[in-house]
Amino acid sequence: MYDKYLVTGATGFLGRAVVEALVRRGARVYALVLHDDPYINLLPKEVHTVIGDVCVKNSLTDFFADADSRTCVIHCAGIVSVASRPGSRLYQVNVGGTWSVLRQCMERNVGKMVYVSSV
């Protein structure tokens, strides 16, 4: 078990299940959530929330501030679309946001990064 878990997409279906499982195991969990996320109150009270966006570098800097080799990042943030031509926001979040999270993981030398995708 790691000292700390950073979870993106923590209020989504998969992300919330991951967060709840970690909390049940007694883990220290930090969740990156959008400032206007209507589901933030559904997270367990033990979860430390950090307001931010995977597409905004400054908010990731705050989220990763204390990350190190004893940290596990679980990246669940993403947008699912069934449109034949997905919009630019989908690309920004799913590709750009994932790249930004991965870059922070490499810069901080985190112990493990788990990428969850529903695509």
Task: State each model region's role.
Residues 27-37:
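Conserved glycine-rich Rossmann-like NAD(P)H-binding loop of the short-chain dehydrogenase/reductase
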